[in-house]
Regions:
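Acidic, glycine-rich segments characteristic of secretory precursors and extracytoplasmic regions
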Residues: 1-36
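Membrane-embedded catalytic interface detector for glycan/lipid assembly enzymes
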Residues: 37-41
Length: 171
């Protein structure tokens, strides 16, 4: 469970960036501003900010370059380890969808359906294809995780790898 659990931990860390620069760049300055979740009330720094839609060149791709591997690398490893089955894979599907949703909010279309273990630099999906694929993955993940919960399967071995609910998936 520890190898599988570590991949789940890696995916959860993508949800809320713990490292200071990542948190500032991804969660606050870029995701919040570009995604339209917040607006800056006072000018910060000098020219080249996201709230003026004129970011510094070095900042533009930071979330993408950071989050794509955080989402897809552990997901692909988990898919291989679980043969694309079971509650851990279902959990990973849900986390992958959330990460892709965040990236889409910042950048629009992203690569999703064609990303595999060989290459992340693949053709981008249109937003229609992206959202249809994300909803399909989300539905499958929720259905499989719900089946696991309803069956009463013991998931306590994953508790140390769940930052939020300690593997109590009834929550």
């Amino acid at each position: 469970a520890s190898l599988v659990g570590n991949y789940i931990l890696n995916m959860q860390q993508m949800l809320v960036q713990g490292q200071q620069n990542n948190s500032q760049m991804i969660d606050h300055m870029i995701n919040s501003e570009y995604g339209g979740y917040i607006a800056c009330v006072a000018q910060w720094g000098n020219a080249g900010n996201f709230y003026t839609y004129d970011p510094r060149i070095g900042w533009v791709g930071y979330p993408f370059d950071t989050m794509m591997p955080q989402i897809f690398t552990p997901f692909i490893m988990l898919k291989d380890l679980t043969n694309g089955e079971g509650p851990v894979y279902a959990w990973a599907q849900i986390l992958k969808v959330y990460g892709a949703y965040l990236l889409n909010g910042m950048y629009g279309p992203i690569a999703y359906t064609k990303v595999d273990g060989e290459n992340m630099a693949v053709e981008y999906d249109s937003e229609e294809v992206l959202f249809n694929a994300m909803f399909a993955d989300l539905d499958e993940g929720i259905t499989n995780l719900t089946s696991t919960v309803l069956s009463g399967e013991d998931m306590s071995s994953l508790a140390t790898f769940d930052y939020v609910y300690n593997a109590d998936f009834t929550k």
